[in-house]
UniProtKB/Swiss-Prot annotation:
Disordered: region residues: 298-319
Alphabetical keyword list: Chaperone, Cytoplasm, Nickel insertion
InterPro entries: UreD (IPR002669)
Annotated function: Required for maturation of urease via the functional incorporation of the urease nickel metallocenter.
Domain of life: Bacteria
Entry keyword annotation includes Transcription regulation: no
Record's protein name: Urease accessory protein UreD
GO molecular function: nickel cation binding
Compartments where found: Cytoplasm
Family: Belongs to the UreD family.
Quaternary structure and partners: UreD, UreF and UreG form a complex that acts as a GTP-hydrolysis-dependent molecular chaperone, activating the urease apoprotein by helping to assemble the nickel containing metallocenter of UreC. The UreE protein probably delivers the nickel.
Organism whose genome encodes this protein: Synechococcus sp. (strain WH7805)
GO terms under cellular component: cytoplasm
Length: 319
């Protein structure tokens, strides 16, 4: 049987806020990608935000595949990047005579944000099949007045089919660095987060304790949050867990927050993260988020009217 070469897909995008003689034209994008990536039509959301879905045309990743995404946001640009479907990673261990130990599929995402820019990185669920090996890196560089939100959910094994990750493994590395505007001041690492889930960590009570779904949300805020405002925000985020199943925790960053989900339900993880997403918009007096058109959801994860500008936490306009 003919051996197929692995994919080495790249996607490079640049976002720019445009002003025309007729007024604010919002954020536009330039760039391109190589197979298996394909860009769908971008839409202009509220507040001039460019909403761009990325399609992975191969239908999933196998061992040896490598994907690279680079996002560059100019001053005052706003964008929401999502994926068209859940990303599947197929089993690798024991499937090849050349590599019986399996091969890793890898994805690297690099984000560079300029002053007053705003990036929402919201891919759909990642599904790892039994014996899959997947490693992802997310690197973000941004100044103190830029906003970055990411929410990622991974399912370790096809639970509905009675499948676990078995000998598979998932590794994740997130690095978030605040650039200094002063030449003599060094950049500051706001978050360096590394996870390695596989083996005993999947079943141990100090690990996932046999819970098949794990999720992380990170928000780097574009303004300082004082003690009272941050405390109130965390209380509201914790109240958003009501009616959802799983273990959900959140804590503060130097300028933002991080939330974790572990449990049985990617739906409940998505619901909680969507509510937090709405909170971060309301806190900055931005329009309530709308679920991207490519998300195949049968239920609405946001409240009927989403969140109005919070009365407990004063809204701050960033730009």
């Amino acid at each position: 049987m003919q051996r197929l070469d692995p994919w080495h897909g790249r996607c490079e995008l640049r976002f720019e806020h445009r002003q025309t003689e007729h007024g604010d034209a919002g954020t536009v994008h330039q760039g391109g990608c190589s197979a298996p990536f394909k860009l769908l039509r971008a839409e202009q959301g509220k507040n001039g935000r460019c909403e761009l879905p990325i399609l992975h045309t191969a239908g999933g990743l196998v061992g040896g595949d490598q994907l690279s995404i680079a996002l560059d946001l100019n001053t005052n640009s706003r964008c929401l990047i999502t994926s068209v479907a859940a990303q599947k990673v197929y089993g690798s261990i024991g499937r090849s005579r050349l590599h019986p130990e399996g091969q890793w599929a890898r994805q690297q995402v690099h984000c560079k944000l300029a002053n007053s820019s705003d990036l929402e990185w919201l891919p759909q669920e990642l599904v790892l099949y039994a014996n899959a090996l997947f490693e992802q890196h997310l690197t973000v560089q941004l100044p103190a007045n830029a906003s970055f939100l990411s929410a990622e959910i991974v399912r370790l094994g096809r639970t509905a089919a009675g499948e676990t990750l078995q000998q598979g493994r998932w590794r994740s590395a997130l690095s978030l660095c605040r650039r200094s505007v002063e030449p003599h001041q060094a950049s500051r690492w706001e978050l360096v987060d590394r996870l390695d889930l596989g083996g005993d960590a999947l079943n141990d009570q100090h690990g996932l304790n046999k819970r098949p779904v794990f999720g992380s949300l990170v928000w780097a805020a574009p303004m300082p949050l004082n003690g009272e405002a941050l405390t109130q925000l965390l209380e509201l985020v914790r109240s958003d867990r009501e009616g959802l199943n799983g273990t959900m925790r959140c804590s503060a960053l130097d300028q933002g927050l991080v939330a974790r989900y572990s449990g049985p339900s990617s739906r409940d993880a998505r619901f909680w993260f969507s509510r937090i997403w709405a909170r971060t918009r309301a806190l900055r007096a931005l329009s309530a988020p709308q679920i991207p058109r490519v998300w195949p959801l049968q239920e609405q994860p946001l409240p009927p009217s989403s969140f109005k500008t919070n009365t407990a936490v004063p809204a701050v306009r960033t730009h």
